[in-house]
A protein has these predicted regions:
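Acidic-aromatic substrate-binding/catalytic surfaces of carbohydrate-active enzymes
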Residues: 21-83, 93
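Hydrophobic transmembrane signal anchors and adjacent membrane-proximal interface regions, especially
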Residues: 4-9, 66-68, 256
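Long luminal/extracellular ectodomains of secretory-pathway precursor proteins
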Residues: 90, 95-97, 103, 108-574
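Boundary/junction segments of secreted and surface-exposed precursor proteins
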Residues: 19-26, 406-412
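N-terminal intrinsically disordered, low-complexity, charged/polar
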Residues: 85-87
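Fungal secretory targeting signals
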Residues: 1-20
Length: 574
């Protein structure tokens, strides 16, 4: 009888809220609430948001719904209370800010009257050291059969093709045709390049629009899952990886109390991508959002400067990253405790980063290829301050380049595998397997695309080059090996004219070792352009080189399927 009364009460509440004319929060009882407006409504339980009604259709159905979690599915946040913390108007449109409280922090839904969706943001109070942190929707798979990111658009593989006997590794299956593969990692995309992403069908679309990405961890090369098919249930997954780890060596961030992720817009429509694109442009033009009542969020300044190489060239199109104060034990990709900003310099080397939160930052700059493709050094400014309402102009910045003479370079120095065969191709599982066991690259004859993006098989990859001068004993040659990524289970020795000058081996130590070569999952998780960038220098005696024909060989001595080395650039200089 009690259950019947509760169901009847809940049904009557749903009927009542369906007739609501503005944004609302209604408590149902037993840690259950209904939120929404005159366009949509959702029933929020202790952990999961279900019964998402939009245009009189339940968009969740039998799927899991909306939730917030960290460290994968291990920890789904439990909501202990809900309340409206602000009720106001903006541009004469009423809105409410609904706060759901968990032990780890506060999840906010900002709902405007007539809005198709809601703004969301999360404020940390007690998240542990992380790791992965995300918000997401798991939606009805018949309503949302397709996925879209800035780099991929199409039908999500049907659950019927995920055959248990065909599973070969982490969330990866051999397709029923026995030739191709099915994996959620093929739906990866660049985090900071997204305009909008989500899942859609012919009548409904659910999208995330993140115009301000300063709360993301990592730099330009940050890539993450966006959408996919849940392999256990078939749910259509719309994944908001606000602190992702899927392609990194490590991620261990301590978040300050008050760290805010968002706001971003969760947007509902009829499945139209052109409409979502138009909404995305509106949101990007509106950021930072003026309606948000948070002093720290609005305390911002700007950073600008002009980068000039020490040889006089402008640092054209250089990648500029504003991150943690230097020195730091973390790589630029691994930084993620606070707020981070990325941009590119223009042709003259000038750059401006607007709307930077006030605080102290470290500046790092590196080549993004193009006219400075040969620059293998990194410019760093250990600390700079950003003050509210002020422009921090760094003036002219001199970036020291290597004074040595270059004997050869294979590939642009840009932290990516762009230019090589399959380098930067759409995310695709096992594409590295198309690279050969043995390869010979002839400097001056071969093209960049003759080198392949990754080395995964046992064999020799050799660079042959001509040296027109007698070796000078006073000049020590330096071999620079820049890796766009590395997945463990592969070892390589490096030879110059038959003499070992180094190695690329996980965990090795010693004079010729790449100490600390840790693994990232890039190559075996469909990445083709980058994982985590690594840089190594191997110095050796000038007597190893000779006047005339020379060669450098990377000999793969140990391999694991789809693991190995993803190349950025190889440079020999003296």
């Amino acid at each position: 009888m009690t259950k019947r009364i509760f169901v009847t009460l809940a049904a009557s509440l749903v009927t009542a809220v369906a007739a609501a004319t503005g944004p609302f929060l209604t408590a149902v009882g037993n840690q259950t609430w209904i939120i929404g407006n005159d366009v949509w409504n959702m029933t929020q339980g202790p952990k999961y948001g279900v019964k998402l009604y939009y245009k009189e259709h339940d968009c969740v159905g039998d799927a899991v719904g909306h939730y917030v979690s960290y460290n994968g599915a291990a920890n789904d946040l439990a909501w202990t209370s809900a309340k409206i913390v602000k009720e106001d108007t903006y541009n004469n449109v009423p809105y409410i800010d609904v706060l759901f409280t968990a032990a780890e922090g506060d999840m906010h839904w900002v709902i405007f009257a007539g809005q198709h969706g809601a703004y969301q943001y999360f404020v940390n109070h007690a998240l542990p050291t992380l790791g992965e942190f995300r918000t997401l929707w798991r939606l009805d798979n018949t309503t949302f059969p397709n996925g879209r990111t800035v780099t991929k658009d199409g039908v999500l593989p049907p659950l019927s093709e995920y055959l248990p006997q065909n599973k070969i590794q982490d969330e990866t299956w051999l397709a029923p045709d026995g030739k191709s593969y099915i994996t959620k990692y093929d739906w990866t995309s660049w985090s900071r390049a997204q305009d909008f992403f989500g899942v859609y069908g012919d009548k409904f679309g659910s999208w995330y629009i993140n115009p301000g990405k300063d709360y993301y961890n990592g730099n330009h090369a940050k890539q993450e899952l966006m959408v996919h098919r849940e392999s256990a249930s078939g749910d259509a997954v719309q994944l908001n990886m606000i602190h992702g780890t899927h392609f990194m060596v490590s991620s261990s961030d301590v978040f300050p109390d008050g760290k805010m992720w968002g706001p971003w817009l969760w947007y509902l429509n009829d499945g139209s991508k052109s409409d979502a694109a138009a909404q995305s442009k509106t949101e990007f033009a509106s950021w930072p959002y003026p309606w948000l009542d948070d002093e720290a969020y609005h305390s911002r300044g700007s950073v600008s400067g002009k980068l000039v190489l020490s040889d006089g060239r402008p640092a054209s199109n250089a990648a500029v990253f504003l991150g943690d104060v230097l020195p730091s034990p973390k790589t630029a990709l691994d930084m993620g405790s606070t707020y981070y900003y990325t941009t590119y310099a223009d042709a003259s080397g000038s750059f401006t980063i607007p709307d930077v939160r006030t605080g102290s930052y470290g500046l790092q700059v590196w080549s993004n290829g193009s006219s400075i493709r040969d620059v293998r050094t990194t410019f760093a400014l250990d600390s700079l301050a950003v003050e509210k309402g002020k422009a921090t102009n760094l003036g002219s910045l001199t970036w020291a380049v290597s004074p040595k003479r270059k004997l050869f370079q294979v590939g642009d120095f840009d932290h990516y595998s762009y230019g090589f065969k399959n380098g930067g191709a759409p995310w695709q599982h096992a594409l590295v397997a198309e690279c050969p066991e043995n390869l010979v690259y002839k400097v001056g004859c071969s093209k960049t695309e003759d080198w392949c993006m990754g080395q995964t098989y046992k064999g020799n990859w050799t660079i042959r080059f001509w040296n027109g001068q007698e070796p000078d004993a006073d000049k020590k040659p330096t071999l620079i090996v820049s890796l766009a990524g590395y997945s463990s289970g592969a070892s390589s020795t490096i030879w110059a004219n038959g003499i070992q000058v180094g190695n690329l081996t996980s965990g090795a130590t010693g004079r010729t070792a790449t100490d600390g070569l840790a693994s990232d999952p890039s190559l075996y998780r469909s990445a083709t352009a980058a994982g985590e960038w690594r840089y190594f220098q191997f110095d050796f005696a000038a007597s190893v080189l000779k006047k005339g024909a020379n060669e450098v060989t990377f000999q793969m001595t140990r391999n694991t399927t789809w693991h190995g080395f993803m190349w950025d650039s190889i440079i020999l200089e003296w």
